């Protein structure tokens, strides 16, 4: 048996499966897809015997690197600006990983393919491993970084923060709604095949440039598993394509999955890479250049376009619009400014941009200074307490944004905002596609066909609404973003740990916080129309040349 080929071993495993012919199995995870005509193959023939030794070696490398980082005093060299953003990133990323593990039973239940079930089971183990080594990385940062505050509350903070809940929405997309939509198209075909390129390849490169070689070790270990996950997703995609009835659903899901991944992943990873780095070499790639290489060329041209030969309509318009938003509409820079605006309710510190940063941004994104430079200068000016409020509550020509109901990223490209009354509530969307996702895609019927398994976008999706009318100091206290002395805030708009320069609860007490979405629903029709027009026309202090 020890010399048996993998092919024969894989065949033996599939023989252990069985399909009852005397009864219809109970459906645990529903799907509107049909697989009656589907081919049933697993091209990689994944089995545990070859899998576990390989993963053990990768784990040994990860934990060896962690030990080496401590012995080599990595934390004396790593940039504080970079590690502060890891408080947010490493609070979010284990959740999508463990959600992906939860998604695998959904796919196994929904896909009648004994060959691929073993590969999906292996993927489930992968995702648990990924989450585990990421949590261990976060713990190591917490134990060795100069300012552990924020790392120590990430599990709680991730769930109650205005940015963390965007990541939660992203991860919950793997396990909610139609089983194939969630566990295959959204997770595997788009998130893992496309956006792990910037997440697990481009971002580790930036980490290394900032003195952090632990994150590259961990995330390259993660990325090395993705080829198998991509194979699983592609196999199920081909099964679905075998039945013409699935084509409208596939085209719907590709549009939704692509756009939601772009809205969330590009917002987060783009910000971490562009605004978390101190490496401003002129030959260093911008996020836009990384995106062009890793997403547009590597995924769109190499993976998506060939699907057209199967008669599938690819969302070319959304790919081009995502690129347009990153390059021409400054999507990532708008997100970074929003995160910095909200610094009092963060659990990480955000470093101010310097002249070196300004010069680099202007080199990579011509016109950046005219749009964002003045605001960042004001951020520097208002960084310390005593004579001013936090920047969100000062007059710096910046209007706090509405929240997108679908992707939950604020409506930052203001001219693209869509407003509509849906399910008895006035909702704002960052784009036409996010509005379509809520109003058309996630509904019990699609193009005249019943789609009962899609579900709805529900819940408390507007973070600001949960805290409407509260005092800012009370919000921060309720969130738990206060240091051990009971008064100093964990978040700061600078990296100076001098107690005299750090904001406390007393510095923010008496500042009322309001929700734009609550205000929108309280307006009359005329007031609402005027407000929306003014919001969409607001350039937020941009200098017109």
Swiss-Prot record:
The keyword NAD applies. Keywords: Iron, Metal-binding, Monooxygenase, NAD, Oxidoreductase. It comes from the Bacteria. Induction: By propane and acetone. Fe cation 1 binds at residues 97, 127, 130, 226. Its cofactor is Fe(2+). It catalyses: propane + NADH + O2 + H(+) = propan-2-ol + NAD(+) + H2O; phenol + NADH + O2 + H(+) = hydroquinone + NAD(+) + H2O. Fe cation 2 binds at residues 127, 192, 226, 229. SUPFAM superfamilies: Ferritin-like. GO terms for molecular function: metal ion binding; monooxygenase activity. Its EC number is 1.14.13.227. Binds 2 Fe(2+) ions per subunit. Belongs to the TmoA/XamoA family. Component of the propane 2-monooxygenase multicomponent enzyme system which is involved in the degradation of propane via the O2-dependent hydroxylation of propane. Under acetone induction, also able to catalyze the oxidation of phenol to yield hydroquinone. The propane 2-monooxygenase multicomponent enzyme system is composed of an electron transfer component and a monooxygenase component interacting with the effector protein PrmD. The electron transfer component is composed of a reductase (PrmB), and the monooxygenase component is formed by a large subunit (PrmA) and a small subunit (PrmC). Probably requires the presence of the chaperonin-like protein PrmG to ensure a productive folding, resulting of a soluble PrmA, which leads to the active form of PrmABCD. This is Propane 2-monooxygenase, hydroxylase component large subunit.
């Amino acid at each position: 048996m020890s010399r048996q080929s993998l092919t024969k071993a894989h065949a033996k495993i599939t023989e252990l499966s069985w399909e009852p012919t005397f009864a219809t199995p109970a459906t645990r995870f529903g799907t509107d897809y049909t697989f009656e005509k589907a081919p049933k193959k697993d091209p990689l023939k994944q089995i545990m015997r070859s899998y576990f030794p390989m993963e053990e070696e990768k784990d040994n490398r990860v934990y060896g690197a962690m030990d080496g980082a401590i012995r080599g005093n990595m934390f004396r060299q790593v940039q504080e600006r970079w590690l502060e953003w890891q408080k947010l990133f490493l609070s979010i990323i284990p959740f999508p990983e463990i959600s992906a593990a939860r998604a695998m039973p959904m796919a196994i239940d929904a896909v009648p393919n004994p060959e691929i079930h073993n590969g999906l089971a292996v993927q489930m183990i992968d995702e648990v491993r990924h989450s585990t080594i990421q949590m261990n990385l976060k713990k190591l940062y917490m134990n060795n970084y100069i300012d552990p505050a924020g790392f120590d509350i990430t599990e709680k903070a991730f769930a109650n923060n205005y940015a963390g809940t965007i990541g939660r929405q992203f991860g919950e997309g793997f396990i909610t709604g139609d089983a194939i939509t969630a566990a295959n198209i959204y997770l595997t075909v788009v998130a893992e095949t496309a956006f792990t390129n910037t997440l697990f390849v481009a971002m580790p490169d930036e980490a290394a440039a900032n003195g952090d070689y632990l994150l590259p070790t961990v995330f390259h270990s993660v990325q090395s598993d993705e080829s198998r996950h991509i194979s699983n997703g592609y196999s199920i995609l081909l099964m679905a394509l075998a039945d013409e009835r699935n084509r409208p659903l596939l085209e719907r899901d590709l549009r939704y999955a692509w756009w939601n991944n772009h809205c969330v992943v590009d917002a987060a990873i783009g910000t971490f890479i562009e605004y978390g780095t101190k490496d401003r070499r002129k030959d260093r790639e911008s996020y836009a250049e990384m995106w062009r290489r890793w997403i547009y060329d590597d995924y769109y041209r190499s993976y998506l376009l060939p699907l057209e030969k199967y008669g599938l309509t690819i969302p070319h318009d959304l790919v081009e619009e995502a690129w347009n938003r990153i390059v021409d509409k400054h999507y990532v820079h708008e997100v970074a400014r929003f995160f910095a605006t909200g610094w009092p309710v963060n659990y990480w510190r955000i470093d101010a941009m310097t002249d070196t940063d300004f010069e680099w941004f202007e080199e990579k994104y011509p016109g950046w200074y005219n749009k964002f430079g003045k605001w960042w200068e004001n951020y520097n000016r208002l960084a310390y307490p005593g004579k001013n409020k936090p920047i969100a509550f000062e007059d710096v020509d910046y209007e706090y944004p509405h929240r997108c109901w679908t992707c939950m990223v604020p409506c930052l490209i203001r001219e693209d905002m869509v407003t509509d009354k849906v399910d008895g509530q006035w909702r704002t969307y960052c784009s036409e596609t996010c509005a379509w996702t809520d109003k058309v895609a996630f509904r019990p019927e699609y193009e005249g066909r019943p789609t009962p398994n899609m579900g709805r976008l529900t819940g408390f999706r507007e973070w600001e609404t949960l805290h409407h009318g509260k005092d800012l100091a009370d919000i921060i206290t309720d969130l738990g973003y206060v240091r051990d002395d009971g008064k100093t805030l964990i978040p700061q708009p600078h990296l100076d740990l001098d107690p005299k320069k750090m904001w406390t609860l007393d510095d923010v007490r008496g500042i009322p916080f309001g929700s734009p979405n609550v205000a929108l629903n309280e307006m009359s029709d005329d007031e609402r129309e005027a407000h929306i027009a003014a919001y969409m026309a607001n350039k937020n202090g941009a200098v017109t040349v």
